[in-house]
Amino acid sequence: MINHSLKQLADMLASKEISSVELTQEYLNRIAQLNPEINAYITVNPELSLAQAQAADQRIANGDAGPLTGIPIAQKDIFCAKGWRTTCGSRMLENFIAPYDAGIIERFNAAGAVNLGKTNMDEFAMGSSNETSYFGKVQNPWDRSRVPGGSSGGSAAAVAARLCAAATGTDTGGSIRQPASLCGLSGLKPTYGLASRYGMIAFASSLDQAGPMAHSAEDMALMMNVMTGFDERDSTSLQREKEDYTRELGKSLAGIRIGLPKEYFAEGLDAGVAKVIEAAVDEYRKLGAEIVEVTLPNTMLSIPVYYVLAPAEASSNLSRYDGVRFGHRAAEYDDLMDMYCKSRAEGFGEEVKRRILIGTYVLSAGYYDAYYLKAQQIRRLIAEDFAKAFEQCDLILGPTAPSTAFKSGEKADDPVSMYLQDIYTIAVNLAGLPGMSIPAGFAPAADGVELPVGLQIIGNYFDEARMLNAGHVYQQVTDWHTRMPEGIAS
């Protein structure tokens, strides 16, 4: 049961071969067995999940089922879900019970999907290793001594360990794609504004975007059909005609132009990862694609630009956590100002504090022009680089991450080294483009352990259907997306 695609599961549910209650219980049993070690979930509520499964079975019996009705989906703990604890991986929201559903949760509920639980994440989505969570680090199912990536590391580990059929994530600078790469699954960050941000706890509002994490491009296309659409409650939501993201699946890739940015294959890319990506490019050649070289000259500026803009927005967004209206409040304080200081000092972890300090600094009167304004100008240049590249090609291919999964704690005391994990993904967020990672093979770590490698596919604005087809066609001639970690009983 746990190795079937979303479409296969939907067919099995429709034919009454299995019930949603049985499927949900199977995943809950696996969570009880494996989650104490992997730590992919922060909150599981079997009573709520099974009630949704019973309702889904009734919908199926009534002939009112959609493609995801009855299918258990894990939700990143950044989305408010009514009646569920919603922590964002932080002590600040340790006991916060959401009073309403996020737009994304509403859409899955309307589709009849089952909320299997809330997945672990880097605190307030700030991290690339899922080591900053107040609720403990997440283990990579491929090697328990390694990180799953972040910030959507819990969702990635849950999908990889077959603790859910699929999951949601959010991506501010690579937080869907990088963990998808490190855990050997597929993940998609849609064009900025396609998926509702209503009820999604904000990190950097001009960069955050929700997206699917699953085993295959086909599974992600089905999820995109549910997740995307205009939401008037979200000021960044785009009004566009509803799309069917499965419509391109299976189309020939003959004649499609694929761009390879030379900057993505320069110094800093692990040799084993480079070899896997080159093999994937060769596969696309065999499928009829035309390979062209493109240039993204401002790529290397994306990290410093991001670490000015994202912390600036975070320092503003996180100012609401003051211990007054909701969130952690210090037990002892002398006056109101002391309460603010102690509540925030106790409630936020070190990485969150670091980014708030950076953001406050770059927004200060003496440095606004030198840092924040300059970063916005370079952000525009990065977007223009992509626009020029897409005049020469239809899709851009490259590595998702510069290396395979690293050891837990290896980069914990070196923030710059950690930040460089997103060197190939951040520019996509800065430009607002869609980006996707799919499994492309395995490469050896320094100790010889073979670990998953992700291939990144970048498209032009609103070109998700073409990207998903490119991933789907590749997955029809390879089996990387079907591989399972050892020790994960099927």
Swiss-Prot record:
Keyword flag ATP-binding: yes
Chemical reaction(s) catalysed: L-glutamyl-tRNA(Gln) + L-glutamine + ATP + H2O = L-glutaminyl-tRNA(Gln) + L-glutamate + ADP + phosphate + H(+)
GO biological processes: translation
Pfam family, one: Amidase
GO molecular function, one term: glutaminyl-tRNA synthase (glutamine-hydrolyzing) activity
Source domain of life: Bacteria
Active site: 76, 151, 175
Its EC number(s): 6.3.5.7
Keywords tagged on the record: ATP-binding, Ligase, Nucleotide-binding, Protein biosynthesis
Keyword Nucleotide-binding: yes
GO CC entries: glutamyl-tRNA(Gln) amidotransferase complex
Known partners and oligomeric status: Heterotrimer of A, B and C subunits.
Recorded family membership: Belongs to the amidase family. GatA subfamily.
Name of the protein described by the UniProt record: Glutamyl-tRNA(Gln) amidotransferase subunit A
UniProt organism field: Methylobacillus flagellatus (strain ATCC 51484 / DSM 6875 / VKM B-1610 / KT)
